[in-house]
């Protein structure tokens, strides 16, 4: 694999199948990207002793909590997307590789299509915005997540076997 050929010290996996609604129709594709590919990345990282930083999601939970989720809360995904992401997390934790899994939610930036850009676009154009009322989330600015990953790596650089879920 490319990972074993290049042999990096750290691999950051931010790739994911994130189309939540489409994942219900194409569960096999969501599972291939969010679980099986992640399992292969973890296996490659384990073989070269690279640290895997994996970006996951709050969709591994059922969304019924009245307070923010914590790392040790029991996952209970309600969607194919959430299930595929949880399967990826579990593949990593059972792979034997050194890893840090970060659960983010509602990732946004000025690039790409995302919920926050849709809200701003509709507000600017004075268009009605239709959204579900059953979801609560905490938007995460992508550059803030990137800075948090860098800080995490700086804190862990002297720790030989960092493993954790954040």
List each language-model region with its residue ranges.
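A short helix->loop->beta-strand "cap" motif at the edges of active sites that frequently abuts
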Residues: 47-51, 97
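NAD(P)H-binding glycine-rich loop region in Rossmannoid oxidoreductase-like domains
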Residues: 1-33
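Catalytic helix-loop patch of NAD(P)-dependent Rossmann-fold dehydrogenases
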Residues: 25, 32, 36-40, 60-102, ...
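Hydrophobic residues in well-ordered beta-strands that form the structural core
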Residues: 53-54, 101
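NAD(P)-dependent short-chain dehydrogenase/reductase
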Residues: 90-151
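CheY-like receiver
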Residues: 2-6, 44, 91, 148, ...
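A recurrent short beta-strand within the Rossmann-like NAD(P)-dependent oxidoreductase core
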Residues: 128-130, 134, 156-166
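Glycine-rich phosphate-binding loop signature in dinucleotide/nucleotide-binding domains
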Residues: 4-7, 47-48, 159-160
């Amino acid at each position: 694999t490319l990972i074993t050929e290049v042999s990096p010290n750290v691999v950051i996996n931010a790739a994911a199948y994130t189309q939540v609604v489409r994942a219900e129709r194409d569960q096999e594709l969501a599972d291939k990207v969010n679980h099986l590919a992640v399992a292969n990345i973890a296996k490659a990282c384990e073989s070269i002793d690279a640290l895997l930083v994996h970006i996951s999601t709050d969709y591994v939970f059922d969304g019924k909590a009245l307070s923010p989720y914590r790392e040790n809360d029991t996952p209970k995904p309600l969607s194919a997307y959430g299930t595929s992401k949880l399967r990826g997390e579990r593949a990593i934790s059972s792979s034997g590789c050194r890893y840090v899994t970060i659960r983010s939610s509602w990732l946004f930036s000025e690039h790409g299509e995302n919920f926050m850009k849709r809200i701003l676009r509709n507000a600017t154009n004075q268009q009605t915005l239709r959204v579900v009322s059953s979801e609560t989330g905490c938007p995460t600015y992508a550059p803030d997540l990137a800075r948090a990953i860098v800080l995490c790596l700086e804190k862990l650089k002297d720790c030989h076997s960092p493993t954790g879920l954040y």
